[in-house]
């Protein structure tokens, strides 16, 4: 097989990008597909393999086995490697990376010029792209004369000036001020609609605004995939649950409930997908912090972190002795780990008896009246109707 495969325009019937390869030194084995015109987010904890995926697609890394394909063409394998400068792939990262000695318009024109476009045509294209990102009046400024948001706009114009087949976004908003990021996010959403995009981010706002689909990676493997709505509605890992803004509680199926390792029973609304839901199978519950009420435990029997004996299960039908008497609800003894005030609301993080953590979002006034502090014994109460139960995939 040749070292440099044909880089001509691809057939539209193939996915825009495919990773079906392994990098042994990083213990990464990825199987990812990006449909043409779709925007895919890759999310996961640090060291999960996200940067490796971008490096494989960009041409900065060659796989040890398997293939990297762009629109059906093999551009990376143990025997084949199309170098980065010959791939129609562009990257937009945290830092704009503009050439300091060139004006904004010359930075944008640099890509087309490097691909053989004549200077006048390249400058015309550059000015068009600058106008499209709202920077037409900044064409003659050098990078040091631009604000962070302006520089990132110019970097986007530069990326799109070469009409790329694939756009890689590596946390492009992470270095921007919170006042600037929303405008750049809207701009990216507008300019990248209909293009093939691979996005790496830790921000759920980026998922909703900039992605159609998402894959969750951990330890170099894909652990979950689907549309953004599907994955965030049914997170299968702690990382995905944090992105979705919910707590994830794991356990074993016990009839129609979930039995945690610490002895608590979790009752909720079971997924309509019955496959995998059977006694003894692993399952997860998702809990929205806004649905969790916090009550001070007036007579704690011991730390939920280190119970002195096997705890008795608690469930909506068998409430804790200290739980409020109400309609069917879950009630779980817990220990407050941290409080995060944010204006009128406070996020309370508490550990169940097996160490699993559940968040509750309550008013800051309530937190003060309850005299909550790390180490406080509480009862977490949440309606069964507000807990979603899923078989563990």
Predicted features by range, described:
Residues 264-340, 364-393:
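Glycine/charge-rich catalytic "coupling/switch" loops of P-loop NTPases
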Residues 58:
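Helix-to-loop junction immediately C-terminal to a conserved catalytic motif
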Residues 142-146, 150:
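Conserved ABC ATPase signature
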Residues 161-165:
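A short, proline-enriched helix->beta-strand linker immediately N-terminal to the Walker B motif
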Residues 189, 201-264, 298:
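Internal alpha/beta loop-helix hairpins
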Residues 75-90, 114, 231, 235:
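ABC ATPase NBD coupling module
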Residues 120-138:
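Conserved ABC ATPase "signature" region
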